[in-house]
Amino acid sequence: MATPNRPWMGLLLLGVLGVLQTPAPTEAALQPNFEEDKFLGRWFTSGLASNSSWFLEKRKVLSMCKSEVAPAADGGLNVTSTFLRKDQCETRTLLLRPAGPPGCYSYTSPHWSSTHEVSVAETDYETYALLYTESVRGPGPDSLMATLYSRTQTPRAEVKEKFTTFARSLGFTEEGIVFLPKTDKCMEVRT
């Protein structure tokens, strides 16, 4: 009996092998022995990676933002971020509440009516931090985001490469990874 479906079977097998070779997104590790007091202070959001539709639509117009991380009264962290939006500086503060081992936090976004879990995956405290955020409850589909925090507005090449490797390990594609352009607006340093 002839096997007219043999070419289709070959394509199907190649497709299955391609799927099997595509790395599945993995959960980010957590910074061992996270020291919250060393994490405090000024950070610049230098890189982002995400699978969310809003990010993919807006990624070309995003720019670097400045964040101040300070202890909160309840033991969590207040993260006050200043960024450029429609040619004006905008500031928002998030309360990160402890949510598990040190370095794990959660916050609720009043804007999106969603809850997010944030993990500090890796940091040297003085130069960079790699964060992983997952939306866990909300009206829309779950979304994932990796963030590169840098203590300066110009992270070193090896820090950028570390972030790219981190983002890829979480399943993000090149299209979903962006290094945010530096801007002079809203970045002034107050003493």
Curated annotation (Swiss-Prot):
Cysteines paired by S-S bonds: 89-186
Main location: endoplasmic reticulum
Annotated source species: Ovis aries (Sheep)
Gene: PTGDS
One GO BP annotation of this record: prostaglandin biosynthetic process
Segments forming a coiled coil: none
Pfam families, per database record: Lipocalin
Protein name: Prostaglandin-H2 D-isomerase
Active-site residue list: 65
Chemical reaction(s) catalysed: prostaglandin H2 = prostaglandin D2
Domain commentary: Forms a beta-barrel structure that accommodates hydrophobic ligands in its interior.
Signal peptide bounds: 1-24
Annotated function: Catalyzes the conversion of PGH2 to PGD2, a prostaglandin involved in smooth muscle contraction/relaxation and a potent inhibitor of platelet aggregation. Involved in a variety of CNS functions, such as sedation, NREM sleep and PGE2-induced allodynia, and may have an anti-apoptotic role in oligodendrocytes. Binds small non-substrate lipophilic molecules, including biliverdin, bilirubin, retinal, retinoic acid and thyroid hormone, and may act as a scavenger for harmful hydrophobic molecules and as a secretory retinoid and thyroid hormone transporter.
Glycosylation sites: 51, 78
